[in-house]
Amino acid sequence: HSTTKYMDGHALTVGGCIVDSGNFDWNAHAEKFPGLTTPDDSYHGVVYTEKFGKKAYITKATSQLMRDLGSIPSPTNCFLLNLGLETLPLRVERHCYNAQKIAEFLNAHEKVSHVNYAGLPDDKYYALAQKYMNEGRTCGVISFELTGGRDAAVRFMDSLKLATIATHVAASITMVLHPASHTHRQMNDEQLVEAGVSPGMI
């Protein structure tokens, strides 16, 4: 999971975290996980699944992978992430509330052809959101498509006054991204559609 997003809340740090419940049977799929089910020469030939059982993955991550990749955040980053955790429930609840209102507004707008948001009853993931999400709240991220395609999306982005244009999402401010001209700008329209990104998507 990215800790840069909601956990931080202000896009001040870059990082990630591993959540491992210790319930996955690595040996049942041994061919897919040779790093856990075969000897690790860098740790005296230990086979993590044999030595650590259900804790095989998290043990490998905190011993061999941290050693090799150096994926340890600085003390300042840890402080900022911990600070962000203090207000996480309040912020996420408000993100969800705000996103729901915006999604409903966009869904009724004549210049919007489609809204992707699991909090809307006509969304293909609505039933799952109601089943699995706390009180049916989904998230703070919405995507929508303007009827005018790429040109309309560019005009929309150029007209923004309150929201910040950014490739980073899920912080405490409202951020907007046009993938066709930002994260996927190297692709032509045909390639965008193949990648599941329409030219007019915001």
Sequence positions of predicted segments:
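Short beta->alpha connector loops at strand-helix junctions that form conserved
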Residues: 1-4
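Flexible, small-/acidic-enriched active-site or ligand-binding loops
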Residues: 164-201
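Active-site C-terminal subdomain of aminotransferase-like
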Residues: 7-141, 145-178
